[in-house]
């Protein structure tokens, strides 16, 4: 992996260092708008503003937004096999890096391709890593409240597909990806050809 893991709060790790462009407004539950600005739920004007998603994780060097839209249910891959350069740590915030690796893999990756085809005012959406989905689950009540305010699609109870492979063994890395349950955040090893719910995330730098 080209990315280096560094410790951040909550027992999660970030793949690389980032710089904030939104200092002062990076707060879980705040809303990302189509014009690249951020507002609080109280300051959101549905008649004059277009919401893109809701911040579900914010720290000194990383902020992550979850889309207002579900994309449906897709398989991690159409066949079994290890995808190179995909981080297999269930704690890391590496959705963007993992998605990039999936998209250039020789293995067809329907979930990552669905995210790549997602039409939005913002670019660079990713299939979230297991660590990112765990972070989302931890803050789901706050995020769901803001999502309701902006008219976003509710989060389903059940398994969401992550971009993370199960790296327990070389065999498991070939066969399984990690899915994360909402709202519990419970992580499960799932056969790569088994579909899971897809909800894109976006990293703010």
Predicted features along the sequence, with ranges:
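Secondary-structure transition/turn motif
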Residues: 68-71, 180-184
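Bacterial N-terminal signal peptides that target proteins for export
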Residues: 1-2
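Short, compositionally biased
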Residues: 15-121, 192-205
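Processing junctions and N-termini across compartments
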Residues: 6-9, 194
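Residue-level detector of solvent-exposed, low-hydrophobicity positions
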Residues: 9, 51, 63-64, 83, ...
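C-terminal motif of bacterial Sec signal peptides marking the signal peptidase cleavage site
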Residues: 10-14
């Amino acid at each position: 992996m080209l990315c280096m893991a560094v410790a951040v709060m909550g027992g999660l790790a970030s793949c690389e260092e980032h710089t904030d462009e939104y200092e002062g407004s990076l707060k879980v539950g705040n809303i990302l708008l189509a014009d690249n600005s951020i507002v609080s739920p109280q300051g959101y004007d549905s008649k004059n503003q277009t919401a893109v998603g809701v911040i579900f994780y914010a720290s000194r060097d990383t902020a992550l937004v979850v889309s207002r839209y579900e994309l449906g249910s897709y398989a991690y891959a159409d066949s079994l096999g290890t995808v190179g350069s995909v981080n297999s740590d269930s704690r890391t915030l590496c959705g963007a890096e993992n998605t990039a690796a999936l998209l250039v893999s020789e293995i067809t990756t329907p979930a990552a391709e669905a995210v790549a085809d997602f039409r939005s005012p913002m670019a660079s959406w990713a299939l979230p890593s297991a660590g990112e989905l765990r972070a989302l689950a931890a803050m789901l009540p706050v995020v769901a409240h803001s999502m309701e305010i902006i008219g976003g699609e509710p989060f389903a109870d059940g398994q969401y597909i992550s971009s993370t492979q199960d790296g327990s063994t070389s065999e498991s890395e070939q066969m399984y990806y990690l899915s994360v349950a909402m709202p519990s955040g419970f992580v499960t090893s799932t056969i790569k050809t088994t579909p899971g719910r897809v909800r894109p995330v976006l990293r703010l730098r």
